[in-house]
Amino acid sequence: MTFKRRNHGRNKKNRGHVAFIRCTNCGRCCPKDKAIKKFVVRNIVEAAAVRDIGDASAYTQYALPKLYHKLHYCIACAIHSKVVRNRSREARRDRNPPPRFGQRAAAARPGAPGPRP
């Protein structure tokens, strides 16, 4: 039978069995190596309230803690929520990670502090 992907959609090599995890979105059981993993780092408070909390804080340079959360999606939920997308047969051969968005350099960001011309 023909196969669609070289790794059969999994990251399991030379292992007979891997543990199952539950999908963050729907609760479906999915093998840990097949699940789509996404690591999310967020501020505890939203951006609008950061300045208010900084003004009200007793400490001058208090760094607000962040929330670190690892999300596990089954394939159906990852496609539905657009974490991953369908790719053509030629594009499936490309094993490079997708380009990262939102990570611009400090110099390229408009309004960033820096040397004045």
Swiss-Prot record:
Q: What gene name is listed for this protein?
A: rps-26
Its protein name is Small ribosomal subunit protein eS26
Cross-referenced InterPro entries: Ribosomal_eS26, Ribosomal_eS26_CS, Ribosomal_eS26_sf
Which Pfam families is this protein grouped with? Ribosomal_S26e
How this chain assembles, per its entry, is: Component of the 40S small ribosomal subunit.
Task: List this protein's GO terms for biological process.
Answer: cytoplasmic translation; determination of adult lifespan
Q: Which residues form a coiled coil?
A: none
Q: Where is the composition biased (Basic and acidic residues)?
A: 87-97
